[in-house]
Regions:
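Glycine-centered coil/turn sites that cap beta-strands in beta-rich domains
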Residues: 1-20, 28, 40-43, 64
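C-terminal tail/sorting-segment detector
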Residues: 1, 42, 51-77
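A short, hydrophobic/aromatic-rich structural module that often spans a beta strand
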Residues: 33-36, 72
Length: 77
C-alpha cells in the first residue's frame, strides 16, 4: 500500500486499517504520527492475532488527520 502525506498534514495521527468484505477489522498496520513524505507499507496477509487470513478481497482505509482515503485490494496466496 503506497500513500503520501502532504506537508500541510505533517505530524497528524495516521491510521492504516485493513477490513474484510463484511466490514470487520482485520489489521491495523499504522497508528501513529508521521511526517510528510511517501510511505510504502507491506501487509503480510495476517490479522491482529498474527494469523494468516484467507485469499480474497480486502479494503484499506487510510486516515491522516481528518482526511480519509479508501481502496480495494485482492489478496492471493
Amino acid at each position: 500500500i503506497v500513500f503520501t502525506i502532504p506537508y500541510d498534514l505533517t505530524n497528524q495521527n495516521t491510521e492504516l486499517r485493513i477490513y474484510d468484505v463484511q466490514g470487520s477489522l482485520v489489521a491495523i498496520l499504522v497508528n501513529q504520527q508521521l511526517a510528510a513524505g511517501n510511505y510504502v507499507i507491506k501487509w503480510e496477509g495476517r490479522n491482529q492475532n498474527n494469523q494468516n487470513v484467507s485469499s480474497g478481497i480486502y479494503f484499506y482505509n487510510i486516515k491522516v488527520g481528518e482526511k480519509v482515503k479508501s481502496g480495494k485490494m485482492n489478496l492471493l496466496k
